[in-house]
Amino acid sequence: MCSAKHLPGYVELHDKYKEKGIDHIICISVNDPFVMNAWGKENNVGDKIIMMGDPFLNFTKDIGADVDKSGRGLGIRSNRYTMYVEDMKVIKLQEEKDTGSCEISAAENFLNLV
């Protein structure tokens, strides 16, 4: 889901986000920086998206987006969410209700909210 729908949507709509005054699109995942770099290259994000790892879940736990997927062999992961930050202040934070979903946090849906 992430590589097929979620991330590509933000790459596709990057210019529209810029038109709305969004300075940076950052993708945060519970992975190390090497995985994030490879994932970014595989999805041709270029300089459109900052790929940021949260391997120890520090940020993910701080915002309450951690989910236990141990039953699926994945351990503690991050739920999908979108966050709009302005001057270091969170303006909007929307988290998916279903961890397998990509509706609320989809690029086209979030674009309409900023």
Describe each PLM feature range.
Residues 1-114:
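Chalcogenol-based redox active-site neighborhoods
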